[in-house]
Amino acid sequence: MLTSTDFSGLLNQRFFNNFLPIPATNSLAKGMITPSFELTDVTNGRSVTLTDFRRRRPVVLAFTRIFTEKQYCPFCFPHIKALNESYEEFLDRDVELLMITSTDLRQSKTVVKDLGLKMPLLSDPSCNNFRAYQTGQALGAPLPAQFVLNKVGQLRYKHLFSFLDHNASIETLLKAVDRL
């Protein structure tokens, strides 16, 4: 499923840096404190640090796979839309949902506008956080993954991409949140 026939911007440095397949080899174990980061929240125009949420509220990190502002991973596009539609369900549970993409700021702004995103979309064009969370990569972009962290930043649930199970369902993520 192509989300667009516009391939402009696809062959950039990020594409070549992430071209060779590296499987998800996440060594983060349940109960570990996850790596912190500071990224730009394109949706709300502010800087977000993961440690800002520690002791305040749990966090769901949804690493997603977007090639350009017009080309989405066919497995991730429906997941992005479902997460956006369910954003209030996470907020109702006093949980922050942060989506992380490898697109640059310009591309990310277009994604926010075109998809009408309500949830924070954090831009990580260097892919440093994808690497820190060991999500893997293939064919020009990092692979998707989801992580549920409790209030102190400990990993309570993780889902890594596989061809049999691309992304954790909304129901699975909400159940993981409800178990916190």
Per-range role (PLM):
Residues 1-180:
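Chalcogenol-based redox active-site neighborhoods
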